[in-house]
Every structure is written in structure tokens, then in C-alpha cells.
Amino acid sequence: MKKPFNVLAIIGKPRDQQAIQTHKEIYHWLRSLGYTVFIDDRLREILTDLPTEHFASLIELGKKADLAIVVGGDGNMLGAARVLSRFDISVIGVNRGNLGFLTDLNPEDFQQRLQEVLDGHYLQETRFLLEAEIHRHGQVKSHNAALNEAVLHPGKIAHMIEFEVYIDDNFAFSQRSDGLIVSTPTGSTAYSLSGGGPILSPSLNAITLVPMFPHTLSCRPLVVGGNQRIKLVVSPENRGTQEVSCDGQVSLPVSPGDEIHIYQSPNVLKLIHPQDYSYYHVLRTKLGWSSKLF
């Protein structure tokens, strides 16, 4: 029987000794099974006892590997996703973070669950990303991708900003607020949820717009189609420099008068889960929802 995965990559920037140990355990276990294994280049100075030729950059890992094993929390997964979504590679997570909505495997007993995946017993789903572009005087000045959300916000100093929102070039509304969260279904359990946004099933082709502290009592989150293009026109009267934050990890500077174009990326993240994975079980356990009554 042909293996579904032959070349594996271990990704993640560990924050503590336990996470470092998890990286080592996964590496040696996979090598004992006969797999070709590459490791995130950021670990080169930490895992000094491993062969240097087995380290590679994220882009190289995306080109070489069939399956990426991301060790850490959702932050590590988000950082990897923005790069790996450009390549034909599947991704699974081992949770060494906090909530871990995107990282299914427990580091204490990863071997059995990961073995099932390597044997071909798994679920795969695709998660779409957003592209965020900053347009100035008709030119794209900067851009990046986001798996969770792209957020327009005031930058380092909190203050109200003014902007207009267009959906497919149709004017939707203007707003004075602390900013706007534009979220994917994947991101609907992240920053968007904290801002009062709805939880969306990951299979939905939809985007949410969640205002941040709007200066009005009538403003509510808005859900639009996933294929619609969102344009935010920043008022030239705003003071200072604003920012668009992608997944809370990459910041794009925004000047008064700029346009922010946000749309669904052509790239998707191929996310692998154990065969018994249930999104609603994840919601119950991570968000502390009540169990069944009968």
C-alpha cells in the first residue's frame, strides 16, 4: 500500500524546554519509521545535535515535504500557514500552546494519532486565507496574507479613525471606530470572537466584518460572501499612520487616504485532522460550553 506521505517537515519555534523536547521526540520517532524528515531552519541553533543538512527554510519545506507537523500553538500554525498555503503540502498541528483551535494532537500521546494519519486514516479540509493589499495613489504599496483575520487599527496609540467600507465596489457604510476586523471562518474563534463577532463553521465560504468600538449604537457585525471583495477607504482627515495587521503577526502601514483591498486568496491551507475530529467538540472543550444533558 502506497504511503500518503513520504517526506515530512517539523515546524515551529519553541518557547520552552518542553516544546524543544517534543520536536526532538517527533524527529527521532519519524526517522525510526524510515521517513525522510526536514526541520524548520529556525531550530538550527536550538537542536544542535541534529544533522545540519536536515534543516531548511519554510519555503524549502513547502517545496520538499508532503506533510508539515507544526509544533506549538495557533500562532505557530498561523505563521506557517501563510507560507505553506502557497505549496502542495498538508499540515497537522501538535499543541504546545494555549487554546489550540488549529493544533489537534496532544504532545503526550502524539505517536498513536500521528501513526494513524501516516497510515492514511485522517480527515482533510481546506481553509481559505485572505489577501490584504494597501493601495496608495493607484499602486499596491504592500500586501500579505492572513489565515485568521486582517485588522485595520490605529497603530501604537489608540484613537478613533474614520473610513468607508465598500463591498464589490458598492458603498456599504462609513464608520468612526477603533478599527475593523475582517475575518475568515477560521478566524471567527479568534480576535473576531473577542470583538463580538459570530462563530462561523469552517466550511462556510463567508467573511465577517466586525467593528471595533464603533462610535454608534446601531453598528453590528456583518457577514458577506467569501468571494466578495472588500475595500476600506481611509479618510484623508485621519491623523498619523494606521496599520493593517495580518493574524497579529505582520503589520502593513496605512496612511490617510489609502485604500485597503481585502479578498479571498487563491491559496488554501490543507489542514489534516485525526479521523475522529469534530469541530463542535473542539468548540465545546476550548470555549467551555456545557456537555450534553441527556
Curated annotation (Swiss-Prot):
GO terms for cellular component: cytoplasm
Pfam families from the UniProt entry: NAD_kinase (PF01513), NAD_kinase_C (PF20143)
Enzyme superclass (EC): transferase
Membrane keyword on record: no
Cofactor(s) required, per the database record: a divalent metal cation
Catalysed conversion reaction: NAD(+) + ATP = ADP + NADP(+) + H(+)
Keywords noted in UniProt: ATP-binding, Cytoplasm, Kinase, NAD, NADP, Nucleotide-binding, Transferase
Function: Involved in the regulation of the intracellular balance of NAD and NADP, and is a key enzyme in the biosynthesis of NADP. Catalyzes specifically the phosphorylation on 2'-hydroxyl of the adenosine moiety of NAD to yield NADP.
HAMAP family per the UniProt record, alphabetical: NAD_kinase
Name of protein: NAD kinase
Organism this protein belongs to: Vibrio cholerae serotype O1 (strain ATCC 39315 / El Tor Inaba N16961)
